[in-house]
């Protein structure tokens, strides 16, 4: 998931310098040993959640890997990943996603390390029964810093909606937070289960069609305001819990699958292939992604004409 675990009992391999093509990225990005994030999170005071029901918090405190075992080095270069044949003629653009739990970030170092884009958590709906909407405390700081550093920026919202009305409310919450900002990447709807607890979404027992409708309600509300919208989900959710194929006919799909060679066969615009990358300028583990495109998505200004069509 987004900003996945900081304690992970899988093989960690440091990157050999020659593993990354110098023309692509620097050697500042590599897989870290498990102690890396533990110590740095303690130093940054990040071992407390934003709120008690922040659905992402548990990912940093449990040994959990919901999307498959990562047995590779989480590098940016193509040496680490096997890309599907359908992407053989497509440019690969590498980036990260971050939330409060990445701590204080030196965005200049991030940019210099070879990162080209960042997806920032706007906020989340609490996974408790109240379902309170909460802004990520570092959202605006991250957005300003990443923008000034020259990174392409998108955002995501971690849902715990159980009705389409709540999904639309989440979209309006996001639109209010990003008002006045320029985004070059989509607004993503992060739909997944809460790790090591039962969130309100799972407790609701919604059908596949109902959970898919949540995604549609959120994305369509975002699109009506002139932004691009997409869906983030892991391999299991896209295949079994929501209609990944159907959603892919309308929106960009951001797949989370922690492996060096995903076999997901539906639309996949971006692949989050590890939650344990380390990036210069960030002290905690960071999710790493590859965007399959000859160029990054249209700027928001290019999408405004769609609004009234």
Please describe what each predicted stretch is.
Residues 20-102, 108, 247-309:
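Functionally critical loop-and-helix segments that line ligand-binding/catalytic clefts
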């Amino acid at each position: 998931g987004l900003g996945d675990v900081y304690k992970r009992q899988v093989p960690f391999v440091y990157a050999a310098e020659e593993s990354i093509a110098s023309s692509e990225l620097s050697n500042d990005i590599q897989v870290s040993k498990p102690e890396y994030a533990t110590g740095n999170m303690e130093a940054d005071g990040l071992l407390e959640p934003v709120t008690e029901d922040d659905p992402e918090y548990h990912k940093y405190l449990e040994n959990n890997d919901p999307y498959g075992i990562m047995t590779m080095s989480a590098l940016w270069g193509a040496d680490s990943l096997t890309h599907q044949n359908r992407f053989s003629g497509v440019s690969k653009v590498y980036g990260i996603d971050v939330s409060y739990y990445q701590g204080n970030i030196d965005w200049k170092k991030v940019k210099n390390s070879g990162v080209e884009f960042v997806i920032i958590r706007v906020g989340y709906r609490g996974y408790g029964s109240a379902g309170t909407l909460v802004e990520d405390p570092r959202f605006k700081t991250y957005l300003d810093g990443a923008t000034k550093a020259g990174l392409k920026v998108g955002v995501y919202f971690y849902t715990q909606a159980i009705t389409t009305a709540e999904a639309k409310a989440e979209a309006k919450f996001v639109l209010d937070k990003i008002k006045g900002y320029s985004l070059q990447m989509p607004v993503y709807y992060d739909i997944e289960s809460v790790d090591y607890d039962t969130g309100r979404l799972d407790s609701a027992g919604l059908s596949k069609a109902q959970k898919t409708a949540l995604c549609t309600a959120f994305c369509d509300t975002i699109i009506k305001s002139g932004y691009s919208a997409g869906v983030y989900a892991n391999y299991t959710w896209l295949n079994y819990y929501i209609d990944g194929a159907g959603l892919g006919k309308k929106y960009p799909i951001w797949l989370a699958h922690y492996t060096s060679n995903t076999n997901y066969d539906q639309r996949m615009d971006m692949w989050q292939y590890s939650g344990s990358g380390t990036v210069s300028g960030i002290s905690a583990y960071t999710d790493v992604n590859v965007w399959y495109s000859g160029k990054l998505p249209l700027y928001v200004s290019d999408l405004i004409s769609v609004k009234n069509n």
